[in-house]
Amino acid sequence: GTGFNFLYNLDQNIKEMIQKWSKQNLIKDLEHVRDGNNLFKDNRGVISNHELTEPINLIGLIDSKKGTIRANHYHPQQEQKCLFTKGQIIEIFQDIINPMAPKITQVVNAGQLSIIKPNVAHTMVFTKDTTFLNLVRGERDHENYGITHTVRHVFVDEKEKNLLMECYKFDCRSCGNTDLKRVVSLGYQPLANNLLKKQNEKCELYPLEMNYCSKCHNCQLSVSVDPKKMFSNYLYTSSTSKVFRNHFVNSAKKYTKELKLNKKKTYIIDIGSNDGVALKPFLDLGFKNVLGIEPAKNLAKLANKNKIKTFNGFLEIKNLKKIKKNADLILASNVFAHSDKLKEMAECMFKLLSKNGS
């Protein structure tokens, strides 16, 4: 009744925009990591080839020991090309032209060529004893250091190096493949729910990046933070969410009906049970035999206080002897996403499950 009409179909236009955006490469390539092409293999070994986009006139041969750092600089005019013949590094780089640019990490393995664009700060953290060739076009004179070839820019210190050496994940958690591709980087971020007591209090920052495994299509974070740091005192309680509570009430009713669960005999385990939000509906329905497994001490204590029996610890092989087995139903909500040991967790679940369990 307003006399207003859309000139175009809104739903169709939104669909077209999404399709168009999906085809755009929004990632600015600051650094390329390339594998060799035209591989030739025989009983003597392997030959691979790398094509360079510009001529070079100098080659530097560099050996570096595990646990050391190189670079911490940028090149104002030249690309830097490094061909790795042995070892492995974590490369950290950042666009110095853009003040909002995140600090990004990338693994480079033996046989790969790393190309860093001009005005990109970068640092190499050597995770293995490593040998590489520095392929230079132009000057490499130390008298020219800081003018056109290399400008010092320290943005990775020993503390950050040690943190990366400790928690970086080089292989797929699912299949073990080491050829992981970075999909997105949000820079370095504090841990979730990491509430500070003082306004200017410092906290540890970790790369928040997603890597993709081309072999099994698993997506995972580039680092694995010590679970004790994350879960020893977990601040989020699931029962504060009405949506969560209603979801688990409906789930308990559904499982009871579809699986024909016996309220007196059925044994139910919930992995990563938080404050017992998924088990409480079963207790309310009259089930007697339930157990939560929760690594956060404060949440396990809260659940036990509320009469929801909970084991405080991680689901891992060494803890199985402390947990009653032969469960008829095992629950796990958003649990694998929080674990670095996917296979061990799955193995533990099968060991806890009864022969005909679900």
Residue ranges and their predicted role:
Residues 167-243:
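N-terminal juxtadomain amphipathic helix
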Residues 331:
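A conserved beta-strand element that flanks and buttresses the S-adenosyl-L-methionine
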